[in-house]
């Protein structure tokens, strides 16, 4: 049985809406864009509903519909939305599963293929809507020229739709054949299998993509859509027939009217089985969404009549009826699309909630690790006399603009609320500089631990919302005095966190500028060239050179000179001697000489503080932020711990002055704590030592005596002991909870202990127990915890 013939050309208007003059002109002059859009848009919802019906009929594999929608950036939005919508339609189904097998791809491809189709339709719809709403003077042909560029854009979008349509069509045929395979009647099965031939479609896509005439291209895409619509109708008819003929499936029934005239839903319609019907209890139910779709389609093709038997002629009739239903000029198509949308949106509450891309939740174990890390970090900061500071999570947009160079595009702008243009903070350094300027502060050593936000592409270990731990010193000091302390703080942080072998790459902004001047880079291009050099930790020099030459306008000769110099790296004092030796080009550059003199002081101080062993003098380090003016540095892990930069900072003498007439020099470092969390979490998991709580004692009442529990646990709290209590008659539940929570001690109190005036202390790690007087147990425990 072949699919029904394509219906006649569609018209615009949807729910009876009038055509705009531009639409009339477009249609009267053979521009098929409106017809394509009008035909394709409703098929987005219809295709999902039909795919869900086929999943039911063929017992499809729906494992692929568990598409991740978290903030990891690993899934496309439309793909995830299709998967979620089909899952909502199938909610409650006892037919679908994860059967797998050779034909599983016919169902597992649904989210991807339907998602791409949805994306292409939306792009075309947006463009067509703009063009059709443009003002047009009818009757004056020259006045309605859309312009060659606009026509090419429409053709390009329509052509982009052709491939998804072709993929949808082939997938629809494949699913329909899987449904046919479920039919027991061999003769009917053969007729249906042999009836679909799509050989005539093989050249369709090629013709669409090579046609040079715009109208021919658009008509080709439109014809593909008509063919897809017919195939989709045939698939729906086959799926309905398979469900109808399968006696193991509980058939949904429409609502019935009671004597009062109100409608009551038949329990079958929602997948529920009537009580007492033993036979029906054995039948499998459809999903609640697919049940509703099936009832609507069945009512259309049968006019409410009972289906006594299914044959090829009846299927042909159903296919024709459904093809007409899927035609945009059919009034009932609106009802079908609205019904599918209603099912999905009504069941929205059943969707698993999700978080935005690039964000994460911290569970109890992660919070324990985070608090431990913060306590170490805060301890180091306070040891150096720093005070805590907090600033707003959003700033005036003008405060942040012009401070981050090319990274300014990553700033999150907020909607205007009350006349102020605001943005989420990109880092903690600029807000600190603004605070110093606003409050006319001349000297301050501060730390801040807070979240920052960047509109970056999320990936593994890279977030849009993340913590930074900042330590900054503002004020006028002796040369390299605060720079030394900030770098020393960084080494202490990484040593105490004990998360791997690291090195701190260090350079000087004036030395970097001198290097670029020596190589022949124009001063106005220093910053943009630095942003390219800054990528050398992720890209080869050949890739960076291509960017310098092709995008930044640097000559090949200049780029090669830069490449020779940025290779210089090694132990600080050795590289310093190399750069200052006789004949060095750096010694002929005033800025470079100043930088090298400052670095000599810094390196000698770090050497005396036993911290220079972690430092690498690296001329390829070029922090991309515009506000750095002196020493710059970046901490990275060595060896197998590949998480990129974990800390960075430098001197920024002019940043405070951007907010006031007074310049206050400053230097600081920022620790990217998210990557530290990941390493610490992995270490704790390997040791199996992650504890969400710090509870030391569990008071276990073998019974339900809350009064006794309150008395005992309060004594422990008053003694400064971290304790919890639990009421249950089963001793195993107490032991299980204490073991899973990592609680080292238990106070066991049962009937015998109550009558004897004693309690039982249990050391879980040593598997030892002892009885002590009820009046002394708190002090005994305090002593044992103090001296384990």
From Swiss-Prot:
It is an enzyme of class 6 (ligase). It catalyses: tRNA(His) + L-histidine + ATP = L-histidyl-tRNA(His) + AMP + diphosphate + H(+). Residues 252-286 are annotated as: Disordered. It holds the Pfam family tRNA-synt_His. GO terms for molecular function: ATP binding; histidine-tRNA ligase activity; RNA binding. PROSITE patterns: AA_TRNA_LIGASE_II. Its EC number is 6.1.1.21. GO terms for cellular component: cytosol; mitochondrion. InterPro entries: aa-tRNA-synth_II (IPR006195), aa-tRNA-synth_II/BPL/LPL (IPR045864), Anticodon-bd (IPR004154), Anticodon-bd_dom_sf (IPR036621), Aromatic_Lyase (IPR001106), His-tRNA-ligase (IPR015807), HisRS-like_core (IPR041715), HisRS_anticodon (IPR033656). It comes from the Eukaryota. GO terms for biological process: histidyl-tRNA aminoacylation; mitochondrial translation. Keywords: Aminoacyl-tRNA synthetase, ATP-binding, Ligase, Nucleotide-binding, Protein biosynthesis. NCBIfam families: hisS (TIGR00442). Homodimer. Belongs to the class-II aminoacyl-tRNA synthetase family. HAMAP family: His_tRNA_synth. This is Histidine--tRNA ligase, cytoplasmic. It comes from Oryza sativa subsp. japonica. The lineage of its organism: Eukaryota, Viridiplantae, Streptophyta, Embryophyta, Tracheophyta.
